[in-house]
Amino acid sequence: MNETMICAVGNVATTPVFRDLANGPSVRFRLAVTARYWDREKNAWTDGHTNFFTVWANRQLATNASGSLAVGDPVVVQGRLKVRTDVREGQSRTSADIDAVAIGHDLARGTAAFRRTARTEASTSPPRPEPNWEVPAGGTPGEPVPEQRPDPVPVG
C-alpha cells in the first residue's frame, strides 16, 4: 500500500484531547511546525512559515501521549499524512492530519525522563528462549542454545 509517511518536528499547539472510545483510547492535538532559516542580512535565525497539523494517536500511544504532552512541548511526530478537504458552511476547507505511529519529545531542545508503562494485558504465549545467532560447533544457525555460564571462580 502506498502511503505518505512523514516526520514532523514542531511544538504542541493545543492541549491534547483524550477520548476513551468503543474501539480504544484516542487523542488529538494540533502541532505547529515552523521553518527556520539563516538570514544573512540580519545575521540571525528567522522564523519562516508555520504549518499546522492535527495529530491523531490511538490505543497505547494515545494514553501515553495524553499523559506526557503539554502545550509548548517540542516534539517529533512520525505518521501517515492525510490531507482532507470538506465543505463547511458553504466554504471548502483543507486540513492536514497526521495519523501518528510514534510521538516523542525533541531531545535536541530539552531533556526527558522516560518511564515504562505497566502492561495491562497478560501475555497469552509462554516466553520463548532467545535464539543464539552464533553457530556452535556442529549446530544450526538460529536454534536456541542452552544458556552457558562460566564456572564460578572460588574467592579467597
UniProtKB/Swiss-Prot annotation:
Residues 1-107 form the SSB domain. GO terms for biological process: DNA replication. Residues 114-124 have a biased composition (Low complexity). GO terms for cellular component: nucleoid. Keywords: DNA-binding. GO terms for molecular function: enzyme activator activity; single-stranded DNA binding. CDD domains: SSB_OBF. The keyword DNA-binding applies. Signal peptide: none annotated. The keyword DNA repair does not apply. Gene3D superfamilies: Nucleic acid-binding proteins. Residues 114-156 are annotated as: Disordered. It comes from the Bacteria. Homotetramer. This is Single-stranded DNA-binding protein 1. It comes from Streptomyces coelicolor (strain ATCC BAA-471 / A3(2) / M145). The lineage of its organism: Bacteria, Bacillati, Actinomycetota, Actinomycetes, Kitasatosporales.
